[in-house]
């Protein structure tokens, strides 16, 4: 644990505003212009950002992989129509929409509500990239023998998608995990 509060200024004797690292006062990275501990603020910000980024990644993967698997499995007109909708949605400028929507939210709305709203808006405009990759992986997996065997045994389309195809395309999601976390962090940083 960090010995200082990230919000409260520390006015201990010998600690000045904008001080360099002071080990005797446990200010390992010093203090900022308001006398707050920089290390405490970094750790607190990192914790919040990682929770936000992992929530973002989970929601993007859920939405993008579900839509991509359904498009890849059904193919034909479902795939063609779905792909056109995804292409149109992907061309909406993501960062501008986030900035516009967040600026319209009234200031009396609580901080947690604003963070959840930002998360939902970012997910709504970011799931399309995962859809393309999951669609391609589903096309590849759909041609394998276990899908044919499941169809012959009477499994329905949703059972095949969620019980057979989705678990076998997890490698695609694992590959994109660090990149999606980095996108979430850099997008929130760009809003600052």
What are these regions, as identified by a protein language model?
Residues 189-192:
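Short, intrinsically disordered, charge-balanced linker/junction segments flanking boundaries
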Residues 73-77, 108, 112:
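Helix-loop interface residues and adjacent transmembrane-helix termini in multi-pass membrane transporters
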Residues 143-146:
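ABC ATPase nucleotide-binding domain helical subdomain, centered on the C-loop/LSGGQ "ABC signature"
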Residues 1, 25, 38-42, 78-85, ...:
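Hydrophobic alpha-helical segments of integral membrane proteins
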Residues 2, 105-106:
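Juxtamembrane "helix exit" motif at the C-terminal ends of alpha-helical transmembrane segments
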Residues 43-47, 56, 60-67, 86-98, ...:
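Faces of alpha-helical transmembrane segments in polytopic inner-membrane proteins
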Residues 71-72, 149:
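Small-residue (primarily alanine) positions within well-ordered alpha-helices
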Residues 1-61, 65, 69-70, 91, ...:
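Gly/Trp-centered helix-boundary motif
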